[in-house]
């Protein structure tokens, strides 16, 4: 779920509830696909993640936010600043925004360290992750816009001993 170039207007509050649908059909549970799909309300009942968030427009180009996600019981705070806005006459041909988010997982300690041999001290900082993104966008026509989203994610704790910041591979379930 990528962010867009848009920010919340000054003195406006945006409340969102996001829902990521789960599996619509599991052949191991029900051989009849239509029955299973209807029973799970076409994936609605099998939510893989639910999130609520509040975003507030400090200015027309600065938004701050807080949120909570079901996945890993994560609370987060975010900020988005748009220093450059595209003009209709293409005098300024693109918009640029910077987005940053800090997350904290509140899941139980035994769940946080599940599946690993723990031979180190528990550290509260293991629960924190950081995300930063530069959003570069241009509306080319009435029906076509493009975005370029270089991003950086750092987790203070991962199960495998790989570089926590620079490896895009994410096979450890975190």
Where are these regions (language model features)?
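Detector for outer-membrane/organellar transmembrane beta-barrel domains
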Residues: 119-174
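Transmembrane beta-barrel domains of Gram-negative outer membranes and organellar outer membranes
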Residues: 1-121, 128-132, 138-140
């Amino acid at each position: 779920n990528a962010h867009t170039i848009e920010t919340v207007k000054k003195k406006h509050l945006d409340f969102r509830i996001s829902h990521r649908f789960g599996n619509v059909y599991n052949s191991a549970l029900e051989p009849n696909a239509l029955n299973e799909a209807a029973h799970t309300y076409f994936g609605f009942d099998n939510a893989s993640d639910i999130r609520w968030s509040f975003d507030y427009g400090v200015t027309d180009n600065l938004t701050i936010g807080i949120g909570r996600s079901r996945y890993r019981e994560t609370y987060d705070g975010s900020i988005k600043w748009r220093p450059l806005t595209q003009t209709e006459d293409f005098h300024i041909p693109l918009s640029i925004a910077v987005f940053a988010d800090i997350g904290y997982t509140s899941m139980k300690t035994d769940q946080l360290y599940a599946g690993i041999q723990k031979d180190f001290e528990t550290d509260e900082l293991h629960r924190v992750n950081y995300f930063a993104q530069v959003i570069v966008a241009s509306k080319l026509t009435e029906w076509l816009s493009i975005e370029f989203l270089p991003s950086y994610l750092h987790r203070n704790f991962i199960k495998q001993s790989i570089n926590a910041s620079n490896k895009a591979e994410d096979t450890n379930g975190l």
